[in-house]
Amino acid sequence: MKFRQKHEDFIVNEILEYELNDYGNYFLYKLQKNGIENLKAISYLSKNFEVPTKEIGYCGLKDRHAITTQYVSIPKEYGKLSLDEDNLKLEYVGTIEKPLKIGRLYGNRFEIIARAVDKDEFLKIADNIRNLSSGAPNYYDDQRFGSVFNGKFIAKEILKGNYEEVVKILLTSYTKSEKKQLKDLKRFIAKNWGNWDECLEYIDKKQIRSKMFRNMVKSLTYENDFKKAFKYVDNRLKELFISAYQSYLWNECLKEFLKEVIPKENRIYVDYSCGTFLFYENIEEELFDKLKEMDFPTIVSDVEYTDPEKRIIKAILKKERIKISDFEKLDFGKLKYTKRPIISIPEDVNTGKFKSDELNSKKYKIDLEFSLKKGSYATIILKRVFNIL
């Protein structure tokens, strides 16, 4: 099975709830991008139209490896804007009263092509698509865990007081998609760990522009204090570290809860970057009706939980060898308390027929369209359909 062999294989259209009017102070635009990161697109608009980035409102980040359409708001004082480039387009929609904010959307519509399908998988895939009416567990998927390397969560290492490991992850771990210059730097630091003068000399010699790397390494040349070096990490990154670990714990709590209510014969396990997901293959209507009305809270230190949440959270934290009070040690960022629906139910599901795949010899492809409410991951639905065969 293959996804995203072309950007056209993964199309995302934002579903926004808004009211146009004639008296608002903001212009609403459709922003379509192809293979461009969200923040880079916003930065480009800012420079091109001389609009400060803080004045460009949007509801959420969209996938880079896709064709995406979302909405942005810009104050009327900058005039009506338009852009028509190959990979980035901006189209005026109308006038709204308030700027767009993160999270203020209904959801997203997805148009996805799954490729390299074998003929003997047709029946099972078709059956799985029919069963989408009973939804799927509403896990956070791999996109949430970009700061996790070799199964190590930076926030967890901080809770353990292991700041050297935190700094080592930040300065030496890399992904395939990172630029060669940065990968070379991280390899050099890993090879010369502790020789901070040499590492700083390398940064200057190669004219590496990253302030974070330079400041962290320079700090270590003065004093081998990894906790102090960590202070040079951007606060937005620190918040991502917390968010990633909190999301992982929520996933583990959901999995533990599902173990209590899903019979063993109906459990299916699917791997992901931080462990395994538990899916259900079939579910009784009575249980489904119960689950679709339920949510599960995120873990924070200042909330009194009741069973079954309290019991499940305690079990997961014991497995992680941390206590809920440990979260009070975090002197940066903030754990966010929210209640997240236990299951995600795709709306308006449409599917095409299996067709010959022009990109993969002797294989087939199939189109799948559906809508999800905000916060739910399309890739979880794809795992439910295509990984349970």
UniProtKB/Swiss-Prot annotation:
GO molecular function: RNA binding; tRNA pseudouridine(13) synthase activity
Entry keywords, A to Z: Isomerase, tRNA processing
GO process annotations (BP): pseudouridine synthesis; tRNA processing
Domain named TRUD: residues: 135-345
Active site per the UniProt annotation: D63 (nucleophile)
InterPro entries: PsdUridine_synth_cat_dom_sf, PsdUridine_synth_TruD, PsdUridine_synth_TruD_CS, PsdUridine_synth_TruD_insert, TruD_catalytic
Disulfide bonds: none
Superkingdom assignment: Archaea
Reactions accelerated catalytically: uridine(13) in tRNA = pseudouridine(13) in tRNA
E.C. code: 5.4.99.27
Keyword check for Lyase: no
Functional description taken from the UniProt entry: Could be responsible for synthesis of pseudouridine from uracil-13 in transfer RNAs.
Family under the similarity heading: Belongs to the pseudouridine synthase TruD family.
Name of the protein in question: Probable tRNA pseudouridine synthase D 1
